[in-house]
Amino acid sequence: MQKEIQPKYNPVEVRCACGNTFVAGSTKDEIKVEICSECHPFYTGKQKNIEKGGRIDKFKKRFKMD
């Protein structure tokens, strides 16, 4: 690799909209994200399971085949 054309890779503070910050490596000066592992529903255990039903359920409901 040619050193003079490669971007500088350095540690950067990543800021989430929830206020959480952590350090990661990047070629950018700063990184802002909307969601991180501290506030994402999958990681916090607060996710909602919504079952609307699939195509078969909709078909049965439409033609009253329950």
Swiss-Prot record:
GO terms for biological process: translation. Zn(2+) binds at residues 16, 18, 36, 39. PROSITE patterns: RIBOSOMAL_L31. Binds 1 zinc ion per subunit. GO terms for cellular component: ribonucleoprotein complex; ribosome. One of its GO terms (molecular function) is metal ion binding. Its cofactor is Zn(2+). Keywords: Metal-binding, Ribonucleoprotein, Ribosomal protein, RNA-binding, rRNA-binding, Zinc. SUPFAM superfamilies: L28p-like. Pfam families: Ribosomal_L31. Part of the 50S ribosomal subunit. Belongs to the bacterial ribosomal protein bL31 family. Type A subfamily. NCBIfam families: L31, PRK00019.1. Binds the 23S rRNA. This is Large ribosomal subunit protein bL31. It comes from Clostridioides difficile (strain 630) (Peptoclostridium difficile).
